[in-house]
Amino acid sequence: MTDVQVIAIDGPAGSGKSTVARAVAARCGLGYLDTGAMYRSVAFAALHGGVAPDDAEVVANLARNMELSIDPDGTVIVDGVDATIEIRGPEVTRAVSIVAANPEVRDEMRARQRRWAAERGGGVMEGRDIGTVVFPDARLKVYLDASPEVRAARRSKEVADLSYERVASDLA
């Protein structure tokens, strides 16, 4: 993977990863991938299919077999269904940490992330552990953080149906 030039942007929810990653990708003319949207897509597929997020084997199979498209404009298509709005909603938000803790799901998403970068010769990728686990040799690694108050305010703006207080408690 040494010929793949990745800019890895990491940080907690609401720290500005997506905003910065999109701006860097646009400015540098590079592809952009929100890896968190990938995990949210698996959670969406599970919930949409009536599968409990903690059913590790079934969720891992969903991750391996789902068709996933994440466009540069943020449109997310999961198995032919536009999930752009739903993956940011409260139901998926509650389920995604369970799904993302599944080692087989992580293995599949990591493989898809590496494949995405290899097909493009690199790009700007944002998400948790992108610079430590997925691309430890990334050309540039950025870690963003913000105060809990700023993170909660940013996240509640992203998810209009969540109150500031609910987001603050989820981020704590």
Give residue ranges: language-model regions.
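Phosphate-binding P-loop
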Residues: 1-4
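Hydrophobic anchor at the beta1->P-loop junction of P-loop NTPases
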Residues: 7-9
